[in-house]
Amino acid sequence: DRPIVIGQMLGEVEPEQLVRSSGLRPGDDLILTKGMGIEATAIIARDKREDLLKRGYTSSRIDRCADFLSDPGISAVRDAQVATQAGRVTAMHDPTEGGVATGLYELASASDVGLDINGDALLLMEETDQLCAEYGLDPFGIISSGAMLIGADPASTEDIVHALARAGIAAS
């Protein structure tokens, strides 16, 4: 009932600067930027505005959720740039389709490693958590454009997280 636009980009990179989703190694740390469900939060707020108003949500709260497309935003380019400049990044993956759960699976599968994840430590904004509860959605499985899963050498993790924070990008 509305147009949908899909795009793809290609580019060139120096081989030594290429970070693949298949580069995760046993013992690496995982960092999640911005949080789960950024785009899903905006979609729900935009598509369910009238229903949310009926459920007691204020217009300003719905507007805040709808604005997740621009703040924190659905591009993870800056996240990747900051992380790779700050320390040893071994793998990166954009958990858009299928959310963070699928992104974690794809990282592990591509890298042929297992993962030990503390789900409670992953970033989840209050707005996203509440909308998921409202509509019976699992935050781990909703579209998460804007977030980035980053594999990091443990010796670099703290430097990467601090650099992201200095750049105004939340990370856990």
What label would you give each PLM region?
Residues D1-S172:
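Helix-biased detector of long, well-ordered alpha-helical tracts
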